[in-house]
Amino acid sequence: MGVITRVNELRSERGWTQAQLATEAGVSRQTINSIETGRFEPSLTLALKLARLFDTPVETIFQLAGER
């Protein structure tokens, strides 16, 4: 079962680049790109960091596929 992510949507709403988000989250731009394209599922730690940066619950950012 995969994960559906709203990282791209939330990042774009805020006018942030992948590089800006990556710097704030302490990861590479490639990691953010891989999360946004569904090639990489973030660790719990990274998911929580992103939730804090977006000021939104983690379950709003990430959902299991088929649970929408």
Task: Annotate each PLM feature.
Residues 5-24:
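Short basic helix-loop element that most often maps to the first helix and adjoining turn
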Residues 22-24, 33-34, 67:
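Alpha-helical and His/Cys-centered functional microenvironments
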Residues 39-49:
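Short, basic-rich loop-to-helix N-cap that marks the start of a DNA-contacting helix
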Residues 52, 62-68:
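Short, charged recognition helix plus adjacent turn
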Residues 1-2:
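A detector for short, charged/polar N-terminal pre-domain segments
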Residues 27-40:
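Recognition helix of helix-turn-helix/homeodomain-like DNA-binding domains
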